[in-house]
Swiss-Prot record:
Provenance organism: Drosophila melanogaster
Enzyme Commission number(s) from the entry: 1.14.-.-
Keyword GTP-binding: no
Disulfide bonds: none
InterPro entries from the UniProt entry: Cyt_P450 (IPR001128), Cyt_P450_CS (IPR017972), Cyt_P450_E_grp-IV (IPR002403), Cyt_P450_sf (IPR036396), Cytochrome_P450_Monoox (IPR050196)
Residue positions binding heme: 477
Entry function: May be involved in the metabolism of insect hormones and in the breakdown of synthetic insecticides.
Keyword Endoplasmic reticulum (UniProt): yes
Essential cofactor(s): heme
Superkingdom classification of source: Eukaryota
Keywords: Endoplasmic reticulum, Heme, Iron, Membrane, Metal-binding, Microsome, Monooxygenase, Oxidoreductase
Gene encoding the protein: Cyp318a1
Similarity remark: Belongs to the cytochrome P450 family.
Segments for region (Disordered): 439-460
Name listed for the protein in its UniProt record: Probable cytochrome P450 318a1
Length: 536
């Protein structure tokens, strides 16, 4: 009898303590959605549990989100998972000092050290140290590298006879392109030629991609971040991740140690710390040469340099190569005059596509619109997660809304950029015209017909944060210019030399959240790549 009373008392005490810990979470749920938000919690828990896998989570979120009032708060233990898919909410979170850090979920990421996942003051310091390495002038100085590797990539496409006029899998073209982008990353980040454009017999590119896929699983299933549980619950995945990680650590570590040793030797004999002779002048500007100086000043260790190099190579290679492939997919499936207009503009403004210059890129307005539209429709990084370091007010709400400390904010860029509320009735259609300045100027003058009036209303309600290809706010992408320049240079060369066609329909894509956007049915996507008879 006494034992039962004691057990009941302990249970009641634990319930009270749990309720006290959750009080701010329930308050947020109430402030956002009232009783409806409270009643929906069991349904949300169930949906979250049964769809907890990268292969399904993005597709299911896209499917279910319209049935709930958003922003949406889900209670998870003593934390809140706050889902946001509107521009005002994005702006508030991305500019809030309380939301600067990544979440513990992202500790499952393969590269969890370095700028990519640094937190608090460490991130602020490291970002300040690394900003000069990605300045406009520095990135613009890499155009000779972009062009050289881009030309090699075109040669590889031309010599791959199995690609010419035949329907090939999307993944086959992706492999060739991703190796070329990895070559650029290794040259501009670490100053080391790797010849990946021709051959990657060590499977470095594949290992990077595979580790990202495994990282995505560890993010949505955080218990796999514990090594013992990962080894017990997913032994094959654990062994594969261990093997790939070792391969990439040896690859990057070997390059960094060799480059650092040579850098110190040059310094010892009185040579330039930054570099090489004039014939290899671009090497004086590479990322790793600049951060070696930070190490010499005692601001970084060699291990931290390796972390930063690994992080930068991975992010620059994966996001850029994926962005280019997504753009080519949009191009190939477009049945309008997009490809013709791009080719006409390039031939009119770029006399020699073998040496594309920055000034020429800046004149390619339709290419800009095409790139922006592909990044809008198929967001390279579909979702962004932020940790709330202390309570903060979610602005833009009619009533006061306080997001409690330790909440996890999910920023759904993918669905926001395809939402009819911000992009109109054709939000899920590929239409580069929407980004053209000329179209905006025509809309601003105003027309009396209903069509232009509807477009004008779309423009007026479009928030500046409704398009976030490289994030924004306090923690925006440090390599935005770098990524855009590579993407545009490569696209100019590919569009000028090849025709891309596909009978696949974008509406049939099955989306996968693998850190960057992937497709469950990628093997069903067939591309026809035909060399042009008259290449510029």
């Amino acid at each position: 009898m006494h034992l039962n009373i004691a057990l009941w008392a302990c249970g009641a005490l634990l319930a009270v303590l749990l309720a006290w810990q959750q009080r701010k979470c329930w308050r947020l749920i109430w402030q956002l959605n009232g009783w409806r938000g409270v009643i929906q919690q069991p349904v949300l828990w169930l949906l979250l549990c049964i769809n907890l896998h990268p292969n399904s989570i993005l597709e299911k979120v896209s499917q279910y989100r319209v049935h709930f009032q958003r922003p949406l708060a889900v209670l998870v233990g003593t934390r809140v998972l706050l889902y946001i898919d509107d521009p005002a909410g994005m702006e508030c979170v991305l500019n809030a000092p309380e939301c600067l850090d990544k979440t513990f979920l992202q500790d499952g990421f393969f590269v969890r050290r370095g700028l990519l996942h640094a937190r608090g003051q460490k991130w602020k310091l490291r970002r300040k140290q690394l900003n000069p390495a990605f300045s406009h002038n520095i990135v613009a100085s890499f155009f000779d590298v972009f062009n050289s590797v881009g030309n090699q990539m075109v040669e590889q496409f031309q010599t791959q006879t199995n690609l010419h006029g035949q329907a090939v899998k999307f993944t086959a073209a992706e492999d060739l392109l991703s190796r070329a982008v990895l070559e650029v990353s290794c040259l501009t980040i670490m100053g080391t030629p790797t010849n990946f454009t021709q051959l990657d017999d060590a499977h470095i590119a594949h290992s990077y991609k595979r580790l990202l896929e495994i990282s995505a699983v560890r993010v949505v299933k955080p218990w796999l971040q514990i090594r013992l549980l990962h080894r017990l619950l997913a032994p094959e995945l654990y062994e594969e991740s261990k093997k790939c990680a070792k391969l990439l650590e040896d690859f990057v570590g070997g390059i960094v140690r060799t480059k650092h040793r040579n850098w110190r030797l040059r310094d010892a004999v009185g040579g330039e710390k930054s570099g090489e002779d004039a014939s290899n002048g671009w090497q004086r500007r590479i990322f790793i040469e600049q951060i070696f100086q930070l190490a010499a000043n005692g601001e970084m260790t060699l291990e931290e340099i390796m972390d930063e190099a690994q992080s930068m190579v991975l992010v620059s290679f994966e996001t850029v190569s994926n962005s280019i492939m997504l753009a080519l997919l949009c191009l190939a499936t477009n049945k309008g005059d997009c490809q013709r207009r791009l080719l006409a503009e390039i031939r009119a403004l770029v006399p020699d596509v073998g040496q594309v210059g920055l000034e020429q890129l800046q004149q390619l307005r339709y290419l800009d619109a095409f790139v922006s539209e592909s990044l809008r429709l198929l967001a390279t990084v579909p979702m962004n997660l932020r940790h709330v370091s202390r309570d903060f007010r979610l602005a833009g709400r009619q009533h006061e809304t306080i997001v409690p400390q330790n909440s996890i904010v999910v920023l759904d860029t993918f669905n926001m950029q395809r939402d009819e509320r911000w992009w109109g009735a054709n939000a899920r259609q590929f239409d580069p015209q929407r980004f053209l300045d000329q179209e905006e100027e025509q809309l601003s003058k105003g027309h009396n017909d209903s069509g232009s009036g509807e477009k004008r209303r779309q423009r007026d309600r479009r928030h500046s944060y409704s398009f976030l290809p490289f994030s924004n706010g306090l923690r925006s992408c440090i390599g935005r210019r770098y990524g855009l320049f590579i993407m545009k240079v490569f696209l100019v060369k590919l569009i000028t030399n090849f025709d891309f066609q596909s009978d696949f329909e974008l509406e049939k894509l099955q989306f996968v959240e693998n850190i960057s956007l992937k497709f469950k049915n990628a093997d069903d996507i067939l591309l026809t790549i035909q060399p042009k008879k008259e290449s510029t």
